[in-house]
């Protein structure tokens, strides 16, 4: 009789999530395990491929539900009356079925103008509850992958970062600063270029189904006073996935400032003491 070879577990592939591509193996994983694998690929700047399959995993949606449930806007309806109370395991199964066969249809967001503190108004887009959940699954994947690649000096709309960390960064690193760039991007969320954003995503994400899903969300349109409008540019302010898409887009500006402008305009490593402080 011949001897049997002992089978060794499949190792993670550099080209994909696993050499073993069976759906059953993937679906047994927890959302945290999946996101940790994606985060590791982001840290090593490996391409993100075959990621669409991760949207078949119910645990990804349960994680999104738990996160969104805590939000004050969980009971705010979009274009339908659907709210957090309408979510169930059966509803998640139907969402996954539509995602699996690329039959998922994004609903136009309900747009409402809300007052600004300094006067005027800004448009706020309110997706349906099911759209919020799917958007949050997409957000978690994009955030896990791109967060390790963002500049440490970027503080907007990022986990564990904000005004306080930005002020601390200024206090600790802005020594002898000689020049500043001041600017305001008006109507940023309304004017984000879809073509440029999708090209940026294609540089690292090698999964056309996942990219089509994101592009579909961008082009879902909006309804204002019961009139439908197409979305030719921008991403809805109020959309779950909008902040991470904005940061992916603006990361190019961060890199340009850090890698081009700062080295070009920094003449020496040490500034002379201001004579005022020598008196």
What positions do the PLM features span?
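Non-catalytic, polymerase-adjacent accessory regions of viral genome-replication enzymes
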Residues: 1-93
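Conserved polymerase palm-domain catalytic core
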Residues: 152-153, 158-161, 165-279
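Residues immediately flanking
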Residues: 79, 140, 183-185
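Hydrophobic recognition helices of helix-based DNA-binding modules
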Residues: 141, 145-146, 257
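Reverse-transcriptase-like RNA-dependent polymerase core
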Residues: 97-120, 129, 133-141, 168-175, ...
């Amino acid at each position: 009789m011949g001897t049997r070879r002992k089978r060794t577990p499949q190792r993670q592939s550099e080209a994909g999530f696993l050499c073993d591509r069976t759906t059953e193996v993937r679906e047994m994983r927890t959302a945290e395990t999946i996101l940790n694998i994606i985060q590791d690929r982001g840290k090593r700047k490996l391409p993100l491929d075959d990621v669409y399959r991760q949207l078949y995993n119910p645990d990804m949606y349960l994680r999104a539900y738990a996160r969104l449930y805590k939000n004050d806007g969980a009971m705010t309806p979009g274009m339908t009356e659907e709210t957090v109370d309408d979510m169930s395991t059966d509803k998640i199964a139907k969402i996954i079925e539509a995602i699996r066969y690329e039959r998922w249809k994004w609903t136009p967001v309900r747009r409402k103008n809300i007052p600004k503190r300094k006067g005027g108004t800004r448009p706020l887009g309110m997706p349906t509850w099911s759209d919020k959940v799917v958007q949050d699954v997409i957000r978690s994947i994009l955030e896990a992958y791109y967060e390790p690649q963002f500049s440490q000096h970027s503080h907007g709309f990022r986990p564990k970062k904000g005004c306080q960390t930005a002020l601390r960064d200024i206090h600790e690193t802005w020594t002898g600063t000689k020049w500043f760039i001041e600017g305001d991007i008006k109507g940023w969320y309304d004017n984000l270029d879809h073509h440029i954003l999708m090209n940026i995503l294609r540089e690292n994400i090698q999964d056309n189904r996942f990219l089509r899903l994101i592009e579909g969300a961008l082009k879902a349109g909006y309804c204002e006073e019961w009139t439908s409008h197409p979305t030719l540019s921008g991403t809805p302010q109020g959309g779950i996935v909008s902040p991470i898409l904005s940061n992916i887009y603006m990361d190019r500006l961060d890199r340009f400032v850090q890698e081009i402008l700062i080295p070009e305009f920094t003449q020496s490593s040490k500034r002379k003491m201001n004579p005022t402080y020598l008196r």
